[in-house]
Regions:
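Short, basic phosphate-binding NTP loop
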Residues: 1-31, 38-50
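ATP-dependent carboxylate-amine ligase catalytic core
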Residues: 18-24, 45-128, 132-149
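Structural beta-sheet core signal
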Residues: 56, 128-130, 164, 284-287, ...
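Short, charged/polar "capping" segments at the starts of alpha-helices
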Residues: 64-66, 113, 168-174, 292-296, ...
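Acidic, Mg2+-coordinating active-site environments of NTP-dependent enzymes
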Residues: 98, 125-246
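Short, conserved loop/helix-junction motifs that constitute active-site signature segments
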Residues: 119-125, 154-159, 276-280, 303-311, ...
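Beta-strand-turn-beta hairpins that frame and shape the catalytic cleft
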Residues: 245-254
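Active-site beta-alpha connecting loops in nucleotide-dependent enzymes
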Residues: 258-333, 338-342
């Protein structure tokens, strides 16, 4: 009896999902490693500006629902078991109940099999955006970049649009798209000026804006509307901000780059800060280490810290041993000082940092 009931519930859920998909003409799946939340917000704002009744959904620890009819966002309250891709069915139901014309969702799946379930059995997006292919979640998606690209490529839609950047895997993605009768649009960063990016009060990379602009192109939305719409997007809670701190005796700039969890994104942030002509001489670099992400710390040791001329490197959080060992072994000739504040409380961290500012 239990098996029969489960089968009936499964069929009902599948039928409801199909009905809800048919009610929402535009469905956008934002995939990739870094910047998905920001791109989701930019696209949601473009579609809203263009007059579509649009619902957006970001994921992660600060998951949000965004609605065309209100400025406030709804915080997604997770069930006790934590994030689960089944919540996407509830998002789909909510958007359909509101009679939304467009649904823009950040892919919340990391496991390659779950990514395919998210795309083909839940959202059924007719526009897929692959933001980038970077080294992260290697334990689940890797261990190589090729395997990460394969996971993203598997989510390319049939008879739809693929929006992505020009990268080492562009031709690979194009071949899959061709086999699936899907049109490819490559984001054009030349359309995004520094003057435009300076209008945001948080850091936006050219890729973020050009990808959103390309989605507008796929839907026939004029560029003026796209540019105007993006400026209306609220920043993600984890968005990177540059903040000046201090007083008449202290002029210090704090760059919140903790949202960047992979080497390339972190180095890109550093290069972008230099491009914007902030003072980057003798910086203090703070690395937040996590016990469940020791592999990430090790990657930063090999691929990030040697590339940044650093006055002081500070390790906080848990399991900073890879950094300590590398510094003691002379792997960071570019780092003048190293301070290990593993497991230190915030007050202790600030007490240590204040004399250095």
């Amino acid at each position: 009896i239990c098996i029969v009931l489960l089968m009936i519930l499964g069929i009902r859920e599948q039928l409801a999902q199909k009905r809800n998909v048919k009610k929402i003409p535009i469905r956008v799946n934002i995939n990739g490693i870094r910047g998905k939340s920001t791109v989701t917000r930019l696209i949601t704002s473009i579609l809203t500006e263009a007059g579509y009744k649009t619902v957006g959904k970001t994921t992660g620890t600060a998951a949000r629902m965004i609605y065309w009819f209100q400025d406030d966002e709804d915080i997604i309250v997770r069930r006790p078991e934590g994030p689960n891709i089944s919540e996407q069915l509830r998002v789909l139901q909510r958007a359909a109940d509101l009679e939304a014309e467009a649904l823009v969702c950040e892919c919340m799946a990391v496991n390659p099999d779950y990514q395919k379930v998210f795309q083909f059995r839940m959202l059924e997006a007719n526009i897929v955006v692959i933001v980038n292919v970077l080294e992260d979640h290697l334990d689940v998606m890797g261990p190589t970049l090729d395997q990460i690209a394969q996971a993203f490529g598997a989510t390319i839609p049939y008879n739809g649009f693929l929006i992505t950047i020009d990268c080492a895997y562009t031709n690979y993605f194009k071949q899959i798209a061709k086999e699936r009768n899907t049109k490819v649009i490559i984001a054009d960063n030349s359309k995004i000026t520094d003057e435009y990016l300076a209008k945001f009060d948080y850091m936006i990379f050219p890729d973020n804006a050009s990808l959103a602009l390309a989605v507008g192109e796929a839907l026939g939305i004029d560029e003026e509307t796209c540019f105007k719409g993006m400026l209306n997007a609220h920043p993600d809670p984890g968005a990177m901000r540059i903040t000046r701190i201090g007083d008449e005796n202290l002029n210090c700039t704090f760059v919140n780059g903790f949202a960047a969890n992979d080497p390339q994104s972190t180095v890109n942030i550093w290069e972008r800060v230099k491009e914007l002509e902030y003072n980057t001489e003798d910086p203090i670099v703070i690395m937040n280490c996590r016990e469940d992400r020791v592999d990430r710390t090790e990657i930063f040791v090999s691929d990030v810290f040697p590339k940044i001329q650093t006055h002081t490197l500070v390790a906080i959080g848990e399991v900073s041993e890879p950094i300590t060992t590398a510094f003691n072994n002379g792997q960071f000739p570019n780092v003048k000082n190293y301070i290990n504040l593993e497991y230190a409380e915030p007050d202790k961290i600030m007490e240590t940092l204040n004399p250095l500012l």
